[in-house]
Amino acid sequence: MRSNPTTSGSEVSAVEKKNLGRIVKIIGPVLDVAFPPGKMPNIYNALVVQGRDNEQTNVTCEVQQLLGNNRVRAVAMSDTNGLMRGMEVINTGAPISVPVGGSTLGRIFNVLGQPVDNLGPVDTNTTSPIHRSAPAFIQLDTKLSIFETGIKVVDLLAPYRRGGKIGLFGGAGVGKTVLIMELINNIAKAHGGVSVFGGVGERTREGNDLYMEMKESGVINEENIAESKVALVYGQMNEPPGARMRVGLTALTMAEYFRDVNEQDVLLFIDNIFRFVQAGSEVSALLGRMPSAVGYQPTLSTEMGTLQERITSTKEGSITSIQAVYVPADDLTDPAPATTFAHLDATTVLSRGLAAKGIYPAVDPLDSTSTMLQPRIVGEEHYETAQRVKQTLQRYKELQDIIAILGLDELSEEDRLTVARARKIERFLSQPFFVAEVFTGSPGKYVGLAETIRGFQLILSGELDGLPEQAFYLVGNIDEATAKAMNLKT
């Protein structure tokens, strides 16, 4: 495919206006457009529908198929209401391009990179096409390194890989949003990095709530928007499938600029990766492709790979991606989640049971996993501590039925000690968050990995057996727990 100049959104020069076609067929969000011979657009080029009497309709489409007989099939990125056969269509000669750089921080964009937050135009002339190749092998940084988050339960039991992909599993109301905001806050403070949030096919209300909470917690700075730590890109579930399918690429393009040009560590959030697959399935059916297993598109693995392979570490910087994964009907063998799992380096599972106990972050220490938790990567000390913590919690889980029926007194001395330590560990895995200060009143804590390991080693060794378990609840490092225990005694 020959390379094209890029155009921002629907900017069209006078020269490009010669490349006019006409709509010959409309089927929902899919348009067939006829062009003059020799003026055919390339695959992925952006087309802009011109209204009657030069009235701009602002419907941008993306070429998906070349049908022959000088016709192309394109998918609309916005509503096709009011479009008619015979309307003029401009070939922009380039893929959809979106604004990139520091001026995107604190703003909300749609799939075309247009701001939708009523704060005026974006102060940048730098744009980038949403379709790019993944970095070449020679550019990749193959060194395995931990991405420290400052969140104890994550760093100890399911550590994130720098430039890796993490699946976030959890129902409504278990603290997913607060965890995401804390990660955005911590990457800015500890790594000098920024974040991009891609809302793919989720509820508009949730997107609005997230924006309001980010403003409240300071992740988005209303007074000085340039001091914000995140850019937001939304393609919500009321939008056509074309927009939902491409909004993930828009967010990724913004993240790639921070990695490649600004040489920063970037966090890319995709909520929800299942909706990306779902939108691709809808588009595939509209384009007339034969469906494969469970009605999904035959190109499912290719589409997922095209997105996921661009999320990686290079020698300049890294994009670490956290993707919320909806599992339809809790069926992990469904092709959509199964294809996603092939790309994940770690999973963070949020538990309603822990949230009900008031233990936040409600990350399940036994269900959450990471490929990074190996002695050759994290070191013997970290690995041993994590395994002993998991064994203690697993034994406590096994004993819970006996405790519920017979009571603690019927357990052996050894088991009673295990239960006491497990309850301390469970509480010590909780942590006050910076972004939750406005709700809880207690200051947030960033706990380094070395401090985290030291704290759990002290609990496991029995040195802190004499302290009350409530001293370990919602504290930062272990020194705070011992200080809290002293206060409880007085």
UniProtKB/Swiss-Prot annotation:
UniProt keywords, alphabetically: ATP synthesis, ATP-binding, CF(1), Chloroplast, Hydrogen ion transport, Ion transport, Membrane, Nucleotide-binding, Plastid, Thylakoid, Translocase, Transport
GO CC, one annotated term: chloroplast thylakoid membrane
Entry's EC annotation: 7.1.2.2
UniProt-recorded Gene Ontology molecular function terms: ATP binding; ATP hydrolysis activity; proton-transporting ATP synthase activity, rotational mechanism
A Gene Ontology BP annotation from the UniProt entry: proton motive force-driven mitochondrial ATP synthesis
Reaction catalysis annotation: ATP + H2O + 4 H(+)(in) = ADP + phosphate + 5 H(+)(out)
Coiled coil: none
Listed PROSITE patterns: ATPASE_ALPHA_BETA
Cell location: Plastid, Chloroplast thylakoid membrane
Residue pairs linked by disulfide bridges in the UniProt entry: none
Main function: Produces ATP from ADP in the presence of a proton gradient across the membrane. The catalytic sites are hosted primarily by the beta subunits.
Family per similarity comment: Belongs to the ATPase alpha/beta chains family.
Subunit structure: F-type ATPases have 2 components, CF(1) - the catalytic core - and CF(0) - the membrane proton channel. CF(1) has five subunits: alpha(3), beta(3), gamma(1), delta(1), epsilon(1). CF(0) has four main subunits: a(1), b(1), b'(1) and c(9-12).
Designated name of the protein: ATP synthase subunit beta, chloroplastic
Species for this entry: Calystegia sepium (Hedge bindweed)
